[in-house]
Amino acid sequence: MKNNASIALAAALTTALTAGPAISHNTFTAMTVPAGYIQDLEMRVTHGCKGSSPVNSVRIKIPEGVTRVSVNVVRDWKVETKMRKLPKPVPGEGGVMITETVDEIMWSAPKSMIPASGSYEGFRFRAHLPN
């Protein structure tokens, strides 16, 4: 059951990322992750396909049940987060109750686009995964 939830999480993140103005080849670095743990996750985005626009923004929708999200800053990209209220508070570090979590992570406006030469950009974040 835990592996199924982990695979579903990876699929949800990948699907959310590819919906955007440019089509690119994306790889989620962790296909299975342990449920109930805090995990470092990365979406690797390559160049836009031939004939499509260059990749100039990346959006990741965080699925329900994922809490305590922190975002890695990608050099030369602007990062923003959109928050959502949790249905009920969950315990965080030091006994502090968490009442909201990141709903979406958006990286945009890079100083230079991802080149089409087989390179990629990694968009990382850390999240507490559901059980």
Q: Can you name each region flagged by the protein language model?
A:
Residues 1-8:
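Bacterial N-terminal signal peptides that target proteins for export
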Residues 10-16:
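Bacterial N-terminal signal peptides
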Residues 22-45:
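N-terminal edge beta-strand
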Residues 29-30, 94-95, 109-115:
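Beta-strand-rich interaction surfaces with strong enrichment in secreted/lumenal proteins
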Residues 39-75:
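Low-complexity, serine/threonine/proline/glycine-rich extracellular segments that form mucin-like
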Residues 65-103:
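A surface/secretory-pathway sequence property marking extracellular, secreted
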Residues 108-130:
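Low-complexity, intrinsically disordered segments enriched in Ser/Thr together with acidic residues
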